[in-house]
């Protein structure tokens, strides 16, 4: 079960992945998370993002933005970079990922996912058999951390158990 939380690959940034090699390996569709993967949370598309999506199209990739955000946020970003989109995707549920592949006319073996969150982005993509890249969040302060901590019983707990 835990293997579903491990990304296939990790990258410092979505912008630093070798997409040319991935295209040569047969990948044809890329699903991206937006916030903290491509831009800071809530930020509009940057010139860097717009140029980046243009280069991906030149390589031959289909691109799609998959977000749990509402349509105005996702549509405005998608329009700016020239990508397809699915809003209120319900990540980590499978439906959004499956719809994304359907829209791009790709299968799990020709699609990859790029995102910054283990418990939504990576888990959802892995449940669909999609190769995953986990990126470092653009703004680590905004990253949602889920930590499993071991805490020893407090002295009070020890007294009550006697």
PLM regions and their residue ranges:
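Short, acidic/turn-prone active-site loops that include or flank metal/cofactor-
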Residues: 88-94, 137-140
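Acidic, Mg2+-coordinating phosphoryl-transfer loop and its flanking beta/alpha structural elements
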Residues: 114, 119-147
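Conserved small/polar residues in nucleotide/adenosyl-binding loops
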Residues: 150-157
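Short, structured coil segments at secondary-structure junctions
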Residues: 80-82, 128
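Non-catalytic pre-domain segments flanking phosphatase-related domains
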Residues: 1-32
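Substrate-recognition element of Asp-dependent hydrolases with the DxDx(T/V) motif
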Residues: 30-32, 37-44, 49-78
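Conserved Lys-Pro-Asp/Glu-containing loop-to-beta segment of HAD-superfamily phosphomonoesterases
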Residues: 94-118
């Amino acid at each position: 079960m835990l293997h579903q939380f491990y990304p296939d690959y990790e990258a410092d940034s979505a912008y630093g992945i070798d997409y040319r090699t991935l295209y040569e390996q047969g990948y044809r569709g890329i699903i991206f998370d937006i916030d903290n993967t491509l831009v800071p949370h809530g930020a509009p598309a940057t010139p860097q993002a717009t140029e980046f999506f243009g280069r991906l199209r030149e390589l031959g990739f289909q691109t799609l933005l998959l977000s749990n955000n509402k349509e105005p946020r996702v549509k405005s970003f998608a329009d700016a970079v020239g990508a397809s989109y699915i809003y209120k995707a319900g990540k980590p549920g499978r439906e959004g990922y499956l719809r994304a592949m359907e829209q791009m006319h790709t299968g799990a073996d020709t699609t990859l996912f790029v995102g910054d969150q283990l418990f939504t982005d990576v888990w959802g993509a892995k449940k669909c058999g999609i190769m995953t890249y986990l990126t470092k969040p653009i703004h680590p302060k905004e990253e949602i951390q889920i930590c499993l901590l071991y805490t020893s019983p407090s002295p009070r707990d020890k007294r009550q158990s006697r």
